[in-house]
């Protein structure tokens, strides 16, 4: 196994997880903040807002999991070796 390919795979795996978590992290923070503001404005709509928030957080978290899957593929099932 070429050490250059191994090193590049490890760096790419780290970058894929890191970059894949930036967008969803910012989005989750914004969504949670807006949900808290919405609940503060209309406390009677708490259940509906919370359900929508949890569903949207799950979709955002899926993007980070895709980055993790790419990283694991680069580390353990490397197609370049």
UniProtKB/Swiss-Prot annotation:
Keyword DNA repair: no
Main location: plastid
Subcellular location: Plastid, Chloroplast thylakoid membrane
Gene3D superfamilies: F1F0 ATP synthase subunit C
Pfam families: ATP-synt_C
Single GO molecular function: proton-transporting ATP synthase activity, rotational mechanism
TM segment ranges: 7-27, 57-77
A cellular-component GO term for this protein: proton-transporting ATP synthase complex
Keyword Transmembrane helix belongs to the record: yes
Topology with respect to the bilayer: Multi-pass membrane protein
Keyword annotations of the record: ATP synthesis, CF(0), Chloroplast, Hydrogen ion transport, Ion transport, Lipid-binding, Membrane, Plastid, Thylakoid, Transmembrane, Transmembrane helix, Transport
Superkingdom: Eukaryota
Site (Reversibly protonated during proton transport): residue numbering on this chain: 61
Family statement drawn from the similarity comment of this UniProt entry: Belongs to the ATPase C chain family.
Note from the entry: In plastids the F-type ATPase is also known as CF(1)CF(0).
HAMAP family according to UniProt: ATP_synth_c_bact (MF_01396)
Subunit structure: F-type ATPases have 2 components, F(1) - the catalytic core - and F(0) - the membrane proton channel. F(1) has five subunits: alpha(3), beta(3), gamma(1), delta(1), epsilon(1). F(0) has four main subunits: a(1), b(1), b'(1) and c(10-14). The alpha and beta chains form an alternating ring which encloses part of the gamma chain. F(1) is attached to F(0) by a central stalk formed by the gamma and epsilon chains, while a peripheral stalk is formed by the delta, b and b' chains.
Biological role stated in the UniProt entry: F(1)F(0) ATP synthase produces ATP from ADP in the presence of a proton or sodium gradient. F-type ATPases consist of two structural domains, F(1) containing the extramembraneous catalytic core and F(0) containing the membrane proton channel, linked together by a central stalk and a peripheral stalk. During catalysis, ATP synthesis in the catalytic domain of F(1) is coupled via a rotary mechanism of the central stalk subunits to proton translocation. Key component of the F(0) channel; it plays a direct role in translocation across the membrane. A homomeric c-ring of between 10-14 subunits forms the central stalk rotor element with the F(1) delta and epsilon subunits.
Identification of the protein by name: ATP synthase subunit c, chloroplastic
């Amino acid at each position: 196994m070429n050490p250059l390919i191994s090193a590049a795979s490890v760096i790419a795996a780290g970058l894929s997880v890191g970059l894949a978590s930036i967008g969803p992290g910012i989005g989750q923070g914004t969504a949670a903040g807006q949900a808290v503001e919405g609940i503060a404005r209309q406390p009677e709509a708490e259940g509906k807002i919370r359900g929508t928030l949890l569903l949207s957080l799950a979709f955002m978290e899926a993007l980070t999991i895709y980055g993790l899957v790419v990283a694991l593929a680069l580390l353990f099932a490397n197609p370049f070796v």
